[in-house]
């Protein structure tokens, strides 16, 4: 399917989620995130995101898990039409080499774990520059899986965590 058509279809479905249904799915996904992160004490800094357009939301017990395990969260900040950086919102500092794991929002994903974003390429450009092999985890609802071909500039994610 054409990426733009798929993007539109998935976004419509995501925006149609009821508050109760979204909350239930978010809880399931956050439980799976905690299960994924629990056996990994080497993760001390994690890249998160502020959800937009009904993306998966991180819930209180996930943030409590981060606090208990002393995992620092950093968030993306758009600094130009083509570039993002990740900053610690508490200290307003930018330390790209200290990110141990990326939790990445997406519009859609395919069977090979390629991410369909909003089409601006921010994450693809950023992730291509990494010098370490940090885990790149897509966060999505299961209905966001679609059939599309990756472009040469698309970055393959290591794993997609969803509600299934």
From Swiss-Prot:
State the family it belongs to: Belongs to the 5-formyltetrahydrofolate cyclo-ligase family.
One Gene Ontology molecular-function label: 5-formyltetrahydrofolate cyclo-ligase activity
Lineage per the UniProt record: Bacteria, Bacillati, Mycoplasmatota, Mycoplasmoidales, Mycoplasmoidaceae
- Cite the SUPFAM superfamilies for this sequence: NagB/RpiA/CoA transferase-like
One Gene Ontology BP term is: folic acid-containing compound biosynthetic process
Q: What is its EC number?
A: 6.3.3.2
Q: Which reaction does it catalyse?
A: (6S)-5-formyl-5,6,7,8-tetrahydrofolate + ATP = (6R)-5,10-methenyltetrahydrofolate + ADP + phosphate
Q: What class of enzyme is it?
A: ligase
Oligomeric and partner information: Monomer or homodimer.
Grouped into one coarse class, the protein's main location is cytoplasm
What function is annotated for this protein?
A: Involved in folate metabolism. Catalyzes the irreversible conversion of 5-formyltetrahydrofolate (5-FTHF) to yield 5,10-methenyltetrahydrofolate.
Any one cellular component term from GO for this entry? cytoplasm
Please tell me where Mg(2+) binds in this chain. 124, 154
**Which cofactors does this gene product need?**
Mg(2+); Mn(2+); Ca(2+); Zn(2+)
The name of this protein is 5-formyltetrahydrofolate cyclo-ligase
NCBIfam families referenced in this protein's UniProt entry, alphabetically: MTHFS_bact (TIGR02727)
| Localization | Cytoplasm
Where, in this chain's numbering, is ATP bound? 3-7, 115-123, 125, 153
